[in-house]
From Swiss-Prot:
Ubiquitinated by MARCHF1 and MARCHF8 at Lys-254 leading to sorting into the endosome system and down-regulation of MHC class II. Keywords: Adaptive immunity, Cell membrane, Cytoplasmic vesicle, Disulfide bond, Endoplasmic reticulum, Endosome, Glycoprotein, Immunity, Lysosome, Membrane, MHC II, Signal, Transmembrane, Transmembrane helix, Ubl conjugation. Changing residue 66 to L: In allele DRB3*01:13. It comes from the Eukaryota. Residues 1-29 form the signal peptide. This is HLA class II histocompatibility antigen, DR beta 3 chain. Changing residue 218 to S: In allele DRB3*02:01, allele DRB3*02:02, allele DRB3*02:10 and allele DRB3*02:11.
Length: 266
């Protein structure tokens, strides 16, 4: 550790801590002792539920697989030369092999039954939105984006249609993206040149819905969009005036209700 005397106690302390961290890292970097990473990975592969199950017990050394047990084979097999003596030794132990073969039922099928309700049977509806990647006039090259998010399981089919006809050319996808919360998302984009009056539809099929989800995007010219916005603005303004008029009317009615002609009983 190197300590330099500088004015100001806090600066000296900060510099001292920094130098201590640096010196510890340098000391660690100077340690030339070999380090190894050993990893064991157990896998269950299911086909058509539990109709066919495959169990794998895999062993890795420094991220390289060197040995595995495969229930389809029934014994250990060396993947590299490093695993050959281990495979020969373990294959000679009949009790160990019987135990590993039994993992298909007492490990894989058992855990499938425990987790089936919240894994295999889990269903979450997708959320679908459609929008252009760029805001620009019609008859210019653009990218229409169909965003499908928050769905489970990951099996999904997304299609693009233009005026009712499926578009296959110019369709690109990000593929499945894991959200980290047991849901997925994907973006499926259509390269096209939108023209006024055209209707683009993104159709999504997913196990969580009984019928396909469809979201439309209509190509409108700037003048049509301006007219639509003007119409919406006029409608909202009319509602505001109507609300203000009704408020004034009912307030006046309430004020007059307290004045009654002489002689009437209330």
């Amino acid at each position: 550790m190197v300590c330099l005397k500088l004015p100001g106690g806090s600066s000296l302390a900060a510099l001292t801590v920094t130098l201590m961290v640096l010196s510890s890292r340098l000391a660690f970097a100077g340690d030339t002792r070999p380090r190894f990473l050993e990893l064991r990975k157990s896998e269950c592969h299911f086909f058509n539920g539990t109709e066919r199950v495959r169990y794998l017990d895999r062993y890795f050394h420094n991220q390289e697989e060197f040995l595995r047990f495969d229930s389809d084979v029934g014994e250990y097999r060396a993947v590299t030369e490093l695993g050959r003596p281990v495979a020969e030794s373990w294959n000679s132990q009949k009790d160990l092999l019987e135990q590993k073969r039994g993992r298909v039922d007492n490990y894989c099928r058992h855990n499938y039954g425990v987790g089936e309700s919240f894994t295999v049977q889990r269903r979450v509806h997708p959320q679908v939105t459609v929008y252009p990647a760029k805001t620009q006039p019609l008859q210019h090259h653009n990218l229409l984006v169909c965003s499908v998010s928050g769905f489970y399981p990951g099996s999904i089919e997304v299609r693009w249609f233009r005026n009712g006809q499926e578009e296959k050319a110019g369709v690109v996808s990000t593929g499945l993206i894991q959200n980290g919360d047991w849901t997925f998302q994907t973006l499926v984009m259509l390269e096209t040149v939108p023209r006024s009056g055209e209707v683009y539809t993104c159709q999504v099929e997913h196990p969580s819905v009984t019928s396909a989800l469809t979201v439309e995007w209509r190509a409108r010219s700037e003048s049509a969009q301006s007219k639509m916005l003007s119409g919406v603005g006029g409608f909202v303004l009319g509602l505001l005036f109507l609300g203000a008029g009704l408020f004034i009317y009912f307030r006046n009615q309430k004020g007059h209700s307290g004045l009654q002609p002489t002689g009437f009983l209330s």
